[in-house]
A protein has these predicted regions:
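Segments of small-molecule ligand-sensing domains
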Residues: 170-242
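Sec/Tat-exported extracytoplasmic proteins
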Residues: 51-55, 63, 76-84, 111, ...
Length: 247
């Protein structure tokens, strides 16, 4: 469901059953409507938490003006104290990345592939570690070469590959993130139905759910914690170097 549809569906069922929405707009969440989309906050927390574990202290977060970019940078700033990071924010001006007069430990560029590629080329010789999100994934050989060494938070590609093979064999074409989320949502509903726990309490079970888009555990406020893989492009492939639990 979209954000608008989620609100309407939540009102229509009036709490009789939980509503899973595929939106990544955290504003629609409440005690009966659960945001199941991959959110900017989840991705930002995952990559920044990993960066902190690797010794990063000072981060410059780049707001590119897109909804995802703005929300990611805002989420990063909100997590600053919790992660013991110092996070400054730079707003993209005229499409140009900020000049790193005093380089931070890391540059967080949550936006799409083109911007991350530009940042990677700019930061390559500066000693600054580049941090990115699933939005940066790009499988073109020249892009993989440019992204070499970048830390990226993404749903686990191995999980997705297994789903994608099955999807393609049955339906043709290659599935996207929405198809994977839809499959996961249907699988969760089926699991709850089979256990006769198709209720809010069932959805909030401590064990969570093993999904194509990562292990998830739902919270009572309508959000969910999602596991992420940390990927690093090396020698033309994305290498999984760590897992982030429950971002």
């Amino acid at each position: 469901l979209s954000a608008a549809e989620a609100r309407a569906a939540g009102a229509a069922v009036a709490g009789r059953v939980p509503v899973l929405t595929l939106t990544n707009d955290s504003a629609v969440r409440n005690s009966g409507t659960f945001v199941f989309g991959i959110t900017p906050g989840q991705a930002a927390s995952a990559i920044l938490g990993y960066a902190r574990s690797r010794g990063v202290r000072r981060v410059l977060a780049v707001d590119d003006g897109t909804p995802w970019g703005r929300a990611s940078v805002a989420a990063a700033k909100m997590a600053e104290a919790e992660l013991s990071l110092s996070i400054d924010i730079a707003t993209l001006t005229g499409g140009a990345l900020p000049v790193l007069a005093t380089p931070p430990d890391a540059l967080f560029v949550p936006g799409g592939s083109a911007l991350v590629l530009a940042a990677a080329r700019q930061a390559k010789d500066s000693g600054v570690q580049l941090l990115a999100t699933v939005q940066a994934l790009d499988y073109r050989p020249d892009a993989l070469a440019a992204l070499d060494g970048v830390w990226i938070a993404s749903p686990d590609p191995d999980r997705f590959a297994t789903f994608a093979q099955s999807y393609t064999a049955r339906n043709g074409g290659r599935p996207g993130a929405i198809a994977a989320l839809g499959y996961d949502a249907a699988s969760i509903a089926r699991t709850l139905r089979d256990a006769d726990t198709l209720t809010r309490e069932g959805l909030l079970g401590e064990s969570g759910f093993d999904c194509v888009t990562g292990q998830v555990r739902f919270r009572s406020d309508g959000s969910c914690a999602r596991d992420f893989a940390i990927l690093v492009p090396r020698s033309g492939v994305y290498e999984k170097v760590a897992e982030s639990r429950g971002a």
